Protein backbone atom coordinates (compact mmCIF):
# COMPACT_ATOMS: atom_id res chain seq x y z
CA UNK A 1 0.00 0.00 0.00
CA UNK A 2 1.54 3.30 -1.08
CA UNK A 3 1.05 7.05 -0.94
CA UNK A 4 2.38 8.68 -4.13
CA UNK A 5 2.95 12.29 -5.12
CA UNK A 6 1.79 13.83 -8.41
CA UNK A 7 4.93 12.52 -10.15
CA UNK A 8 4.28 8.95 -8.93
CA UNK A 9 7.14 9.06 -6.40
CA UNK A 10 6.55 6.88 -3.33
CA UNK A 11 6.20 9.14 -0.29
CA UNK A 12 4.98 6.47 2.10
CA UNK A 13 4.34 2.75 2.00
CA UNK A 14 3.43 -0.31 4.01
CA UNK A 15 4.20 -3.74 2.59
CA UNK A 16 2.43 -6.90 3.70
CA UNK A 17 3.09 -9.91 1.49
CA UNK A 18 1.24 -13.16 2.05
CA UNK A 19 3.56 -15.60 3.80
CA UNK A 20 1.16 -18.45 4.53
CA UNK A 21 -2.41 -19.21 3.52
CA UNK A 22 -4.52 -16.54 5.22
CA UNK A 23 -1.54 -14.75 6.80
CA UNK A 24 0.31 -11.63 5.69
CA UNK A 25 3.52 -10.28 7.19
CA UNK A 26 3.64 -6.53 7.75
CA UNK A 27 7.34 -6.30 7.09
CA UNK A 28 8.08 -2.72 6.05
CA UNK A 29 6.90 0.83 6.63
CA UNK A 30 8.41 3.91 5.06
CA UNK A 31 7.57 7.62 5.20
CA UNK A 32 9.51 10.25 3.28
CA UNK A 33 11.23 12.86 5.44
CA UNK A 34 8.90 15.54 4.07
CA UNK A 35 5.90 13.81 5.70
CA UNK A 36 7.38 12.50 8.94
CA UNK A 37 5.74 13.54 12.19
CA UNK A 38 2.35 14.09 10.54
CA UNK A 39 0.73 10.75 11.34
CA UNK A 40 1.10 9.44 7.80
CA UNK A 41 2.57 6.08 8.83
CA UNK A 42 -0.23 5.47 11.31
CA UNK A 43 -2.89 6.41 8.79
CA UNK A 44 -1.40 4.19 6.12
CA UNK A 45 -0.97 1.27 8.50
CA UNK A 46 -4.55 1.70 9.66
CA UNK A 47 -5.72 1.46 6.06
CA UNK A 48 -3.55 -1.61 5.51
CA UNK A 49 -5.04 -3.27 8.59
CA UNK A 50 -8.56 -2.47 7.36
CA UNK A 51 -7.70 -4.03 4.00
CA UNK A 52 -6.25 -7.12 5.67
CA UNK A 53 -9.33 -7.51 7.86
CA UNK A 54 -11.70 -7.03 4.92
CA UNK A 55 -9.86 -9.79 3.07
CA UNK A 56 -10.30 -12.18 5.98
CA UNK A 57 -6.56 -12.48 6.54
CA UNK A 58 -4.50 -12.36 9.71
CA UNK A 59 -1.40 -10.20 10.19
CA UNK A 60 2.06 -10.98 11.49
CA UNK A 61 3.82 -7.65 12.16
CA UNK A 62 7.60 -7.92 11.93
CA UNK A 63 8.73 -4.34 11.31
CA UNK A 64 9.18 -2.33 14.50
CA UNK A 65 6.62 0.33 13.57
CA UNK A 66 3.89 -2.24 12.91
CA UNK A 67 4.65 -4.05 16.17
CA UNK A 68 4.36 -0.74 18.04
CA UNK A 69 1.17 0.21 16.16
CA UNK A 70 -0.57 -3.01 17.22
CA UNK A 71 0.54 -2.46 20.82
CA UNK A 72 -1.11 0.99 20.71
CA UNK A 73 -4.27 -0.35 19.02
CA UNK A 74 -5.32 -3.40 21.07
CA UNK A 75 -8.74 -3.30 19.41
CA UNK A 76 -7.06 -4.93 16.40
CA UNK A 77 -5.41 -7.75 18.38
CA UNK A 78 -7.86 -10.24 16.89
CA UNK A 79 -6.13 -9.83 13.53
CA UNK A 80 -2.77 -11.00 14.84
CA UNK A 81 -1.56 -14.36 13.60
Residue ranges and their predicted role:
Residues 37-49:
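Conserved acetyl-CoA-binding loop-helix of GNAT-fold acetyltransferases
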Residues 29-36:
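A short, internal acetyl-CoA/4′-phosphopantetheine-binding micro-motif in the GNAT/acyltransferase core
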Residues 47-81:
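C-terminal structural segments of small proteins and small subunits
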Residues 1-24, 28:
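N-terminal first-folded block
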